[in-house]
Amino acid sequence: MAEDLSAATSYTEDDFYCPVCQEVLKTPVRTTACQHVFCRKCFLTAMRESGAHCPLCRGNVTRRERACPERALDLENIMRKFSGSCRCCAKQIKFYRMRHHYKSCKKYQDEYGVSSIIPNFQISQDSVGNSNRSETSTSDNTETYQENTSSSGHPTFKCPLCQESNFTRQRLLDHCNSNHLFQIVPVTCPICVSLPWGDPSQITRNFVSHLNQRHQFDYGEFVNLQLDEETQYQTAVEESFQVNI
């Protein structure tokens, strides 16, 4: 399939995955200067939290782009025509239907155990394996995320595979890849649980694989954990009215 895709287009399967959420693109948008592509929601969230720079290469992003990024319509059309393999069950799925497939793919849910989208405080149609979260639970998780922090300001976690503690996200990732790469034991992800949308009852079958797929970046760099999604959305809309078109 990948060979057919490359032969017919200039794209590879990697081009259909967002560098922020590490999932198949949803409503892809493209930066003008560096031509990098992101999910629209991921891009707007990154702009809100990180300023006027591309989330991938730190290239310049215009003020207009920050509010109204350009849709990557060419990529959307390609995603409707070509299929790729589900990363868990290997079933061939049209790229634009991949996220929908994840919602019913048992192997995907057993492997990753959490929502197939970038952080979402209110469960949406793209969520996988999460139950509805109450306001109280969200608040408690946010406080936990803030309290368990290192001197550098980054949250710290305990490894669920050996109980060694005080790891930042990156150190936990490195530790597990070095010491537990082939250890497949059902556990709860401490990073997911600490986040406002985390579900403490959600079990991840392959924790190290989950870390490598889900936690390659610190969510706090892209999302304001003090604000719910609706507040962030409204703020982005208000700011868009101030942009000179």
Curated annotation (Swiss-Prot):
Any single GO CC term annotated in Swiss-Prot or TrEMBL for this entry: site of double-strand break
EC numbers for this chain: 2.3.2.27
Reaction it catalyzes: S-ubiquitinyl-[E2 ubiquitin-conjugating enzyme]-L-cysteine + [acceptor protein]-L-lysine = [E2 ubiquitin-conjugating enzyme]-L-cysteine + N(6)-ubiquitinyl-[acceptor protein]-L-lysine
Biological process, per Gene Ontology: cellular response to leukemia inhibitory factor; DNA double-strand break processing involved in repair via single-strand annealing; double-strand break repair via homologous recombination; protein ubiquitination; Wnt signaling pathway
Residues annotated to bind Zn(2+): 86, 89, 101, 105
Zinc finger (C2H2-type): 157-180, 187-215
MF annotations from Gene Ontology: protein kinase binding; single-stranded DNA binding; ubiquitin protein ligase activity; zinc ion binding
UniProt xrefs under PROSITE patterns: ZF_C2HC_RNF, ZF_RING_2
Pfam families in the record: zf-C3HC4_2, zf-Di19, zf_C2HC_14
Modified residues (N-acetylalanine): 2
Start and end residues of each stretch annotated as Disordered: 125-154
UniProt xrefs under CDD domains: RING-HC_RNF138
Locations listed in the record: Chromosome
Residue ranges occupied by any UIM domain in the UniProt entry: 225-243
Modifications the protein undergoes after translation, according to the UniProt entry: Auto-ubiquitinated.
Keywords, ordered alphabetically: Acetylation, Chromosome, DNA damage, DNA repair, DNA-binding, Metal-binding, Phosphoprotein, Repeat, Transferase, Ubl conjugation, Ubl conjugation pathway, Wnt signaling pathway, Zinc, Zinc-finger
Modified residues (Phosphothreonine): 142
Zn-finger region bounds: RING-type: 18-58
Protein's pathway: Protein modification; protein ubiquitination
UniProt zinc finger (C2HC RNF-type) residues: 86-105
UniProt domain comment: The zinc finger domains (C2H2-type and C2HC-type zinc fingers) bind DNA and mediate recruitment to double-strand break sites. They show strong preference for DNA with 5'- or 3'-single-stranded overhangs, while they do not bind blunt-ended double-stranded DNA or poly(ADP-ribose) (PAR) polymers.
Subunit architecture: Interacts with NLK. Interacts with XRCC5/Ku80. Interacts with RBBP8/CtIP.
Protein task: E3 ubiquitin-protein ligase involved in DNA damage response by promoting DNA resection and homologous recombination. Recruited to sites of double-strand breaks following DNA damage and specifically promotes double-strand break repair via homologous recombination. Two different, non-exclusive, mechanisms have been proposed.
The name this protein goes by in its record: E3 ubiquitin-protein ligase RNF138
